[in-house]
């Protein structure tokens, strides 16, 4: 196996990491997410991959996207446990 191979994040991986940052308090409720460009550099992926991750979080109700303003955190991610 080539030791120079680096892990490439996918949209699901990035969404999961952002969820962890929200739950741990690194990212706070009503705080604006970093710009897509910053996130794409952080995760070494395209802005399209970042958009897909953010859209996933929006579908889950964790963030809201405000055109021209940014993406804002609405709430913490809650795992539902079956009784």
Descriptions of predicted regions:
Residues 1-83:
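Short linear motifs at protein or domain termini
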């Amino acid at each position: 196996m080539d030791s120079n191979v680096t892990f490439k994040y996918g949209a699901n991986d990035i969404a999961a990491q952002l969820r962890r940052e929200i739950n741990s308090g690194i990212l706070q409720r009503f705080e604006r997410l970093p710009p897509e460009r910053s996130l794409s550099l952080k995760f070494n992926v395209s802005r399209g991959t970042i958009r897909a991750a953010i859209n996933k979080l929006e579908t889950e109700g964790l963030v809201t996207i405000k055109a021209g303003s940014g993406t804002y955190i609405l709430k913490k991610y809650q795992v539902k446990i079956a009784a």
